[in-house]
């Protein structure tokens, strides 16, 4: 059993965390504003960078790792102080391997290990061959039953996976639009969007046209990103592990230990009702992937093959007598009412803003409708020996099947909730992941004592 070294990108990973140390000497330039101060700051920054790069190179040279035939990983760093860490395969809940484009060009991989029952993870920068060797030793893929989405299933996977990037891009664009910028490629891109918005403004007010065009562009960007991940996507299962891999530009692989699975989350939204299928997310330990494990049609048996014993909450609405209305409707109702008030005021003061404000109001009204759906359907049940729950978050209705045997249950009651015999129930899973169900009847919780 030979010891192996880390990839040189581990130095860059360390230097990225210390970037503030290089920027601190540049703060004096903001006050001095002269070439001498700038030269001094650059020299100090270069000196700090050189020292930290030398220390990082020494740590990289002194750091080693090895894994034996039983899947026990030992990592050591020896530079003045000896630091060792040991992790057995039986203690590992999940493992992910990420290969962004820059890493692939350098032959590197980022391996993240998620120990069972812990929030702290272990990140290793290894070569592509060593990363695959480590994954095969700790979570072997033997006699795996694999499934690759085809045709319409791959299209549904791409559409339902296009969620998070749009929100982040919208925030970034909003920040960039609020700041002055020099004419460059970014300015040219905004100029093209302005032309599209001007074309749409022939039929719509300018603000509304910009909102629609920007939303369409961001959704298309998110769709392209999700479609790139759906390329070469495969999900597989063995007797002890569950995994998936895929990606065209950014390669991603995930392996989960079946004995350490926390829950399976089936997310419903207007898009899932239109496509007739739902994305399924699986959590193990503190690993909460943003990419669905698979897209499942309710009449298909594949989910039961991957997760035997998987159960869904009942579809019938729950009894809403005494259920807390503020807990469900206030988060969306307050901004919706405020936008309605601003729309009414703008009708007489700034008519040009009326239609854009109506668009924002419509978004909050849709969130209010989703809150009503959660008010009717949110709850917790025991189905076929499995604990299942349903809760509403934004536009998504989460149908969750608990797969671990020992989630921690916390009940919180206000005086008004105690008067109607209802409680807020929080489930805490190994790794610190939490799910909250609001205003549940105490009489429907036989596994708790009230």
Where are these regions (language model features)?
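N-terminal basic, Ser/Thr-rich segments that initiate or prime the first beta/alpha elements at protein or domain
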Residues: 1-450
């Amino acid at each position: 059993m030979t010891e192996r070294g880390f990839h040189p990108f581990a130095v860059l990973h360390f230097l990225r965390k210390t970037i503030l140390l290089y920027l601190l000497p540049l703060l004096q330039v903001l006050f001095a504003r002269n070439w001498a101060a700038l030269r001094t700051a650059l020299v100090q920054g270069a000196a700090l960078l050189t020292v930290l790069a030398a220390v990082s190179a020494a740590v990289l040279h002194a750091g080693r790792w090895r894994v034996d035939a039983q899947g026990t990983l030992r990592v050591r760093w020896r530079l003045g102080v000896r630091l060792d860490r040991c992790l057995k395969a039986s203690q590992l809940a999940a493992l992910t391997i990420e290969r962004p484009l820059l890493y692939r060009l350098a032959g590197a991989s980022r391996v993240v290990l998620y120990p069972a029952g812990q929030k702290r993870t272990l990140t290793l920068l290894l070569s592509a061959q060593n990363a695959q060797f480590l994954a095969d030793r700790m979570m072997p893929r033997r006699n795996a039953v694999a499934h690759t989405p085809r045709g319409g299933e791959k299209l549904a996977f791409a559409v339902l996976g296009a969620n998070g990037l749009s929100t982040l891009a919208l925030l970034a664009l909003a920040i960039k639009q609020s700041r002055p910028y020099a004419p460059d490629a970014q300015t040219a891109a905004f100029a093209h969007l302005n032309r599209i918005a001007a074309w749409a403004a022939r039929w719509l007010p300018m603000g509304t046209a910009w909102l629609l065009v920007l939303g369409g562009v961001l959704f298309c960007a998110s769709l392209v990103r999700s479609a790139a991940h759906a390329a070469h996507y495969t999900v597989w299962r063995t007797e002890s592990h569950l995994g998936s891999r895929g990606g065209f530009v950014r390669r991603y692989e995930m392996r989960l230990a079946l004995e350490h699975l926390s829950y399976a989350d089936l997310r419903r939204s207007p898009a899932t009702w239109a496509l007739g299928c739902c994305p399924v997310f699986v959590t193990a330990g503190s690993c909460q992937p943003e990419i669905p494990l698979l897209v499942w049609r309710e009449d298909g048996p594949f989910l039961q093959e991957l997760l035997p014993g998987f159960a869904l909450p009942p579809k019938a609405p729950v009894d809403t007598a005494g259920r807390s209305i503020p807990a469900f409707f206030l988060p969306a109702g307050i901004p919706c009412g405020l936008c309605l008030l601003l729309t009414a005021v703008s009708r007489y003061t700034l008519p040009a803003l009326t239609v854009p404000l109506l668009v924002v109001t419509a978004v909050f009204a849709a969130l209010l409708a989703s809150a009503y759906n959660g008010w009717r359907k949110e709850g917790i049940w025991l189905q076929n020996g499995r604990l299942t729950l349903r809760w509403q978050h934004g536009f998504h209705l989460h149908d969750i099947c608990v797969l671990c045997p020992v989630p921690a249950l916390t009940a919180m009651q206000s005086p008004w909730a105690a008067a109607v015999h209802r409680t807020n129930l929080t489930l805490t899973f190994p790794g610190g992941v939490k799910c909250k169900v609001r205003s549940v009847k105490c009489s429907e919780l036989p596994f708790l004592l009230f």
